[in-house]
Curated annotation (Swiss-Prot):
CDD domains cross-referenced by the UniProt entry: Ribosomal_L20 (cd07026)
Keyword tags: Ribonucleoprotein, Ribosomal protein, RNA-binding, rRNA-binding
InterPro entries: Ribosomal_bL20, RIBOSOMAL_L20_CS, Ribosomal_protein_bL20_C
Similarity comment: Belongs to the bacterial ribosomal protein bL20 family.
Gene transcribed to yield this protein: rplT
Primary role: Binds directly to 23S ribosomal RNA and is necessary for the in vitro assembly process of the 50S ribosomal subunit. It is not involved in the protein synthesizing functions of that subunit.
UniProt-listed Gene3D superfamilies: 6.10.160.10, Ribosomal protein L20 (1.10.1900.20)
Keyword Ribosomal protein attributed: yes
One Gene Ontology term from the biological process aspect of the record: ribosomal large subunit assembly
SUPFAM superfamilies: Ribosomal protein L20
Protein name: Large ribosomal subunit protein bL20
């Protein structure tokens, strides 16, 4: 008996067409273009997840640098001072302190300065 593949093919098409919901034009209606659009979108999503880490690290460094320069230290000198002082706060926490808790961040900068002065 021959095997007919109507059901499995329909399910495969439906999977891509539901994933392409909201896309413009034929990208949401035509199977082939929808499949290409969905596969490309998944590639962009994969790359975006890698770029997001890079972008956030850049943002944190910018914020730390701005906060440190208010107290007269460059970013690199500040980070070196933290290492010498034995303060192990990551960049995300330091950036949050620099933006939302300026007084606490200034105290940390002073501790880094003191460690550099030794």
């Amino acid at each position: 008996m021959r095997v007919k593949r109507g059901l499995s093919g329909h399910r495969r098409h439906k999977k891509y067409l539901t994933a392409a919901k909201g896309f413009r034009g034929g990208r949401s209606r035509l199977y082939r273009t929808a499949r290409e659009a969905v596969e490309r979108s998944l590639q962009y999503a994969y790359v975006g997840r890698k770029l997001r880490k890079r972008d956030f690290r850049t943002l944190w460094i910018l914020r730390i640098n701005a906060g440190a320069r208010l107290s007269g230290l460059s970013y690199s000198r500040f980070m070196h001072g933290l290492k010498l002082a034995g303060i192990e706060l990551n960049r995300k926490v330091l950036a949050d302190l620099a933006v939302y808790k300026k007084d606490d961040f200034a105290k940390i900068v002073d501790m880094a300065k003191a460690a550099l002065g030794k």
